[in-house]
């Protein structure tokens, strides 16, 4: 009689682990990955402390910290290859890998050490790309489609991809293809009233898709329906935690530093994922993003920079603001020394929906504060994405990059897996 083990009791497995993390402002970095099996139940309580590197001056602005946990099924990455792989079982062709470069830190954005083989599983890299493309780039930006990590620039491979600034008038413009006008061909002697209404309807549905429905699930929700994350191979956001990292100023205590002070930021946090049932094999990604509010030294309120104001500019007339097309302005309209050739589009009246931060000119010549010193340049995408080098001058040292965190991931997974003893005692 054979005593081959053909199953296992569902038991809790403690997958708790530590993380000693370092990252850059505005870049999305993976801080933990857990492979999961169909039928698992995954739960996590992460407890840690986040620190900014020592500041050169007193603490001026709190930073905002976002921590996310996503579930990415392997089928979303490998497609039909995964289905065939599972059907073929032990006779299946091994799953593909992707290539990294030879540096130890060129897979750090995925939360792993780069192996000696310079190859990592495809689902790690493609899973990260899927998360970034669906949740962290502006919808009008092109998807990141690199096939291998060795195609990335060094900053992306080490620190993660650049993310958008927190929203304001110049960091969250309308899509660049936004129409400022639309022509309708008519007869020279008459206007087709019904055709005019049809043109309005076409414009309305086009604008809805341009601004609010660039993804399939958004389109379906506009009809009153609902799609699962599986419909468009979208990673499932399981949990998000948001906090503001604050700190304190430290006064000098010895003779050489007496009277001097510098900022220190240490913020404890907790990120809890309630028990989540895993429907099929995949990976649980936990990622972190630290950002300063976009505070620019030369930013000006739009009405103050415009000069002679028209009725439309200043009246706040709801009839006009509700019916006028978007307005195209330039960086010069919201920044001193801004480039008038760098255009972007905003909704009419947007200057009444937003107030810029003000930085006294006394700060302008001082380094050490988390301010954007010069008007952002480059194309629209370059201006919207955070440049972490803008903040290098804030820190005394960046040996542990611009922020670091020490965290305990308390992870419990309930899964059907033989015990270690059962695996040792083969048959």
From Swiss-Prot:
The entry's localization annotation reads: Virion
Query: Which keywords does this Swiss-Prot/TrEMBL entry list?
Result: Capsid protein, T=1 icosahedral capsid protein, Viral genome ejection through host cell envelope, Viral penetration into host cytoplasm, Virion, Virus entry into host cell
Major subcellular location class = virion
Q: Does the keyword Nucleotide-binding apply?
A: no
A GO biological-process term: symbiont entry into host cell
Question: Which GO CC terms are listed, alphabetically?
Answer: T=1 icosahedral viral capsid
Q: Which Pfam families does this one have? A: Phage_F (PF02305)
Q: How does it assemble?
A: Pentamerizes and interacts with H protein, G and B pentamers to form 12S pre-assembly complex. By binding with protein D, induces joining of twelve 12S complex to form the procapsid. The procapsid has an external scaffold made of 240 copies of protein D, 60 copies of the internally located B protein, and contains 60 copies of each of the viral structural proteins F and G. Upon genome packaging, interacts with protein J. The mature virion is composed of 60 copies each of the F, G, and J proteins, and 12 copies of the H protein.
Family, as annotated: Belongs to the microviridae F protein family.
What this protein is called in its record is Capsid protein F
UniProt source species: Enterobacteria phage phiX174 (Isolate Sanger)
